[in-house]
Design a protein with these regions (language model features):
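Non-catalytic, topology-defining segments of multipass membrane proteins
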Residues: 1-127, 171-314
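Active-site-proximal inter-transmembrane loops
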Residues: 73-80, 139-161, 165-168
Length: 338
């Protein structure tokens, strides 16, 4: 409902001084250009220290980029109050918040206001945008460095589950595993129960069926829908094979980290070390290159249905003929996605 939507717009202005269009645009650009030089706040590019301690400054600098606002700010509110109050007087919301705190709580209200003013720069701009792309665990092998800082998203609205968010950016629910908790989803469900919100989309749930004898288009659709789950399972397969087949003298921890990344994310010297290690293990080389071939299937958006089916079927046949039991089992797993 418009009233609920407007409440959150008002709350954003009152507690942060941020403009809805700028917030949405910078967030969208971050997802579109993640871990590249165009990412407004990537610790992989700018360094963790820079994003952690200067995240708010990075946000403000990008908010002044008109190209970003025009390209990524589409579909955001553009009514009279947005133009004439929230945007024109963006800094006055936090002053009103200070006044309200002092009126309601007396002198202690100044301390409450100070905590409110520090909360977003430290937790969202610093911790989520910094640590959330540097340290933590990953449920999904998506193309960026996003991590889940903690399995319980309580203090920062569920954004602690940042890898889940990047894997399924349009999902209203950030928790994915049974042991994870997203307090933002808890609030959304309350609003939905009261008829004040509607959940449009959540992350797809993996379902299984007996392995199809041949790949069909429904197989391709299921694999592409669950591609992050597919690549996470493939990463586990690679980790097991690393322990068995990695040549002596090669750093297992370092190699595991590099193999988690796509070739585009690797430096030239890292690529060279990987190739040197793979030259000494035919099985590891096969598993590594088969992963690249698998990702190419859904990266080529111009392929027809028939081409997609053929490419996935060819991959499965190649895996089963490789003589590597783990690849044969993975082919069966792919054909079992429902």
């Amino acid at each position: 409902p418009p009233a609920v939507s407007h409440f959150f717009r008002f709350w954003l202005w009152l507690t942060t001084g941020m403009v809805t269009k700028a917030w949405a645009a910078i967030h969208r650009k971050h997802h579109a250009k993640c871990e590249t030089a165009e990412d407004p706040h990537s610790p992989q590019v700018l360094g963790l220290k820079k994003v952690l301690w200067e995240g708010a400054e990075l946000y403000r600098a990008e908010a002044r980029n008109q190209e970003t606002l025009e390209k990524y700010g589409h579909g955001t509110p553009d009514d009279w109050i947005e133009r004439n109050l929230y945007t024109r007087h963006s800094g006055k919301g936090i002053l009103l918040m200070l006044l309200l705190n002092v009126v309601l709580f007396g002198p202690i209200g100044i301390t409450i206001w100070a905590v409110q003013m520090a909360w977003i720069p430290i937790t969202a701009a610093g911790i989520i945008n910094g640590v959330g792309h540097y340290w933590g665990y990953r449920n999904f092998a998506c193309e960026d460095a996003s991590t889940n800082i903690l399995p319980w998203g309580i203090l920062i609205g569920g954004e602690e589950l940042h890898n889940n968010h990047h894997a399924y950016g349009t999902s209203a629910r950030l928790s994915n595993k049974w042991y994870e908790f997203d307090i933002g989803w808890f609030y959304i469900r309350i609003l939905e129960t009261l008829g004040l919100a509607k959940v449009r989309r959540t992350a797809p749930v993996v379902r299984w069926q007996p392995a199809r004898p041949m790949v069909d288009f429904s197989t391709v659709q299921a694999v592409i829908t669950h591609r992050y789950d597919v690549m996470t399972r493939y990463a586990r397969l690679m980790n097991k094979q690393l322990k068995r087949h990695l040549p002596q003298g090669v750093n297992v921890v370092k190699m595991r980290e590099w193999l988690r990344l796509s070739p585009a994310e690797l430096k030239q010297d890292e690529k060279a070390e990987i190739e040197q290690a793979l030259e000494k293990s035919e099985k590891l080389a096969k598993i590594y290159h088969m992963r690249q071939e698998l990702t190419h299937i859904w990266e080529r958006s111009t392929l027809t249905k028939e081409q997609l089916v053929k490419n996935l079927q060819d991959w499965c046949q190649k895996a089963e003929a490789s003589g590597i039991e783990a690849l044969k089992d993975f082919s069966l797993k792919l054909r079992s996605y429902a």
